[in-house]
Amino acid sequence: MTDPTTTTTFPDATFDSDGPDRGAASFNPVMWFPPAEKQFVQTCYRMADSILEYGSGGSTVFAARETSARVVSIESDRAWAEALSAHLVAEGIDRPDVAVNWCDIGPTRGWGQPGKASSWGRFHTYPLQPWSIPGFSPELVLIDGRFRMACLAAVMLHCQRPTTVLFDDYTRRKTYHAVEQVLQPNARIGRMVRFEIEPKDYDRATYACMLPWFFSTD
């Protein structure tokens, strides 16, 4: 049953995980990346033993169907998370090590965006939630949902091994470039960038730079 406080609606269109619409009468999530980015993501997914997704959809379906990786996908839109989980079952590609985890950030609107600023006290749980899962240490992270800068900070602060981060929409959204006060992208693939994160301790100045990232909902 959908949470009555969630404001998500599904208009008549095809459900696309990263495309212009998240509504459909027929639920069929696809990877809505441009061709170069799509190929790059698929290649990285096939090589990874464990994947963390911030934002779920076509990439989750691809991971479940085409890889043997452990997958944790964080989703702020409860109705979308439930529909995606049901889709994996219907397609016969659900497995115990593929999890779509709804994160309660309060009421949401389109694309799982926060619906009420008064719920800000929950927002930090979205980037931090997967790092409390016992035994989960992702090799690859796709940042393609909400709170993207905070998600990058969470990887930096919690990763236990070298971790590749794919950050979508980075090149066309200048707000995200604030992270370059702390680290630089290792590669650019169309609108996406790749970061290579190593486990390390950070100094106070770096923490001070990262703190505002947790207040950005983009």
Regions of interest found by a model, annotated:
Residues 11-13, 65-70, 91-99, 161-166, ...:
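P-loop/Walker A phosphate-binding loop and immediately adjacent motor/lid segment at beta-alpha junctions
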